[in-house]
């Protein structure tokens, strides 16, 4: 009876209020591909985790997951899996700070069979207590345990955003906080879905081989969604006075994961972004070995697995080789990602006779080297040769961003978010007409190294010695085994000495217990 009553209320909401106020129709973006075998539907709502109610951090994520991981009024989640298996269809939801996107992919021959599933999930989701309890438990486990244990790299990135956006609705992870997730009830989810996912904050995307009648039916059915009363606030990232460092101390960390960043006032909506793409690619293109950071830290000194730079949020950098759509943001920042470097305890065990007295590991040296490289390129600019080579690479590389219909459609939806028609086409044209002066001017305008936030996730044995070195700007010589040191080129030895004494504008250092994060 309780669920039947809820479905009646939700259905009434989805049919829309009996009022004279017109609701904005959802924008429709189509990418017709007559030779494609697959159909892709993306429903992007302009509400993300930043729209989570205060005290309910994680509600947007949990709601979206309950839609796609639950059932409909006619079919349970288990029945849906059995129904869809022969179709090889799939669907999922992603939530970022400002948007939530539902993606449906299926073969064109199954349009008639699959569409009732899509319609049922979006218009009459079952929202059962059983599904809610299961998904809430998984989400809480991630916030309380998984993020701290599975990847110190992701941990450091989310902790940096906690610093950058502290006090704003961007601060918490998309999955929320421990207290926020614990407080969410099934009633919260039902109410939030009925008020936050509306036709007036929706962009409908279709790609592939589908009849015009399908597009019309989809648009007509989604008009039954109510008008949204939830708006996502757009914060401004804080600019610190100096370099603020937060060191997260955790037991049994095998290295120091470093992530640093500062706000920038440019996004894909701005033409300056293309110029920064060239500078960023030269400094540290994601998962590419030719970047300056990678060359200096990994290739030359074998300090870690890789080092990269960014001019916008990069989703799941540990697994994605190329940028993915679905994470557009208005509040932006530049960042440096240094994959974990060795701590003193590990180096002492590895080289007891040579480094037995070592007090701190490689993190201070790596941070200094990375910041110094950014500092140098801002001051000195790119050379003509580096500019031409990097721009040529990027004009080819961005064409790989949309290698599937789903990605192509996703980038088209993101383009609308930024006020553009087709960003992938726009950026190629922008790169084509860029000059070296454009790039060097953009770096001087948007990049600097005097004010930034730094997050380091490290072992509890390393945290305080590391904090002391950074707070006091103590020189941090690179630590090599004797056999490695003996074979170093003279130019590397000379550069090491300069890096070890490079002054960071550190004005604040805090050590935080891992149990006190994301509460």
Locate the predicted segments by residue.
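Sec/Tat signal peptide C-region and signal peptidase I cleavage site
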Residues: 18-25
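M16 family metallopeptidases and their MPP-like homologs
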Residues: 31, 36-62, 68, 76-123, ...
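A short, acidic, amphipathic alpha-helical segment used as a generic capping/interface helix at domain edges
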Residues: 433-442, 446
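Bacterial N-terminal signal peptides
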Residues: 7-18
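An aromatic/glycine/proline-enriched structural segment found at the starts
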Residues: 166, 199, 203-266, 458-462, ...
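Positively charged n-region of N-terminal signal peptides that target proteins for export
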Residues: 1-7
């Amino acid at each position: 009876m309780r669920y039947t009553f809820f479905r009646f209320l939700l259905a009434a909401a989805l049919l829309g209020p009996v009022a004279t106020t017109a609701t904005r129709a959802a924008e429709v973006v189509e990418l017709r591909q007559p030779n494609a075998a697959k159909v892709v539907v993306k429903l992007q709502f302009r509400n993300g985790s930043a729209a989570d109610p205060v005290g309910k951090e994680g509600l947007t994520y949990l709601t979206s997951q309950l839609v796609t991981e639950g059932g409909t009024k006619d079919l349970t989640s288990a029945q849906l899996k059995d129904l869809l298996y022969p179709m090889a269809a799939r669907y999922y939801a992603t939530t970022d700070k400002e948007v939530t996107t539902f993606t449906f992919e299926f073969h064109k021959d199954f349009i008639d069979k699959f569409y009732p599933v899509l319609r049922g999930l979006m218009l009459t989701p079952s929202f059962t207590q059983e599904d809610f309890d299961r998904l809430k438990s998984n989400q809480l486990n991630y916030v309380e345990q998984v993020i701290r244990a599975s990847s110190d790299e992701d941990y450091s990135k989310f902790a940096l955003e906690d610093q950058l956006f502290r006090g704003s609705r961007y601060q918490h992870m998309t999955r929320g906080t421990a207290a926020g997730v614990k407080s969410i009830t099934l009633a919260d989810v039902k109410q939030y879905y009925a008020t936050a996912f509306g036709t007036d904050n929706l962009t409908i995307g279709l790609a592939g081989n589908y009849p015009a009648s399908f597009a019309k039916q989809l648009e007509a059915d989604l008009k039954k969604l109510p008008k949204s009363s939830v708006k996502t606030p757009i914060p401004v990232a804080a600019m610190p006075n100096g370099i603020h460092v937060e060191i997260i101390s955790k037991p049994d960390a095998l290295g120091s994961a470093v992530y640093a960043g500062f706000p920038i006032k440019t996004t894909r909506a701005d033409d300056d972004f293309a110029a920064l793409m060239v500078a960023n690619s030269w400094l540290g293109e994601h998962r590419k070995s030719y970047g300056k950071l990678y060359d200096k830290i990994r290739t030359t000194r074998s300090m870690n697995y890789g080092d990269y730079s960014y001019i916008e949020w990069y989703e799941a950098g540990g697994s994605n080789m190329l940028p993915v759509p679905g994470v557009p943001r208005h509040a932006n920042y530049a960042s440096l990602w240094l994959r974990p470097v060795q701590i003193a305890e590990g180096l002492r065990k590895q080289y007891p006779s040579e480094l037995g007295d070592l007090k701190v590991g490689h993190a201070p040296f790596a941070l200094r080297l990375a910041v110094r490289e950014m500092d140098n390129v801002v001051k000195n600019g790119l050379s003509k040769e580096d500019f031409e080579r990097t721009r040529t690479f990027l004009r080819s590389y961005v064409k790989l961003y949309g290698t599937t219909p789903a990605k192509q459609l996703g980038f088209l939806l993101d383009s609308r978010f930024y006020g553009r028609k087709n960003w992938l086409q726009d950026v190629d044209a922008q790169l084509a007409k860029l000059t070296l002066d454009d790039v060097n001017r953009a770096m001087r305008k948007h990049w600097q190294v005097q004010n930034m936030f730094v997050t380091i996730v490290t072992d509890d044995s390393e945290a305080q010695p590391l904090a002391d070195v950074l707070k006091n700007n103590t020189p941090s010589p690179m630590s090599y085994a004797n056999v490695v040191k003996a074979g170093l080129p003279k130019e590397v030895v000379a550069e090491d000495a300069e890096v070890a004494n490079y002054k960071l504008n550190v004005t604040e250092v805090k050590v935080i217990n891992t149990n006190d994060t994301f509460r």
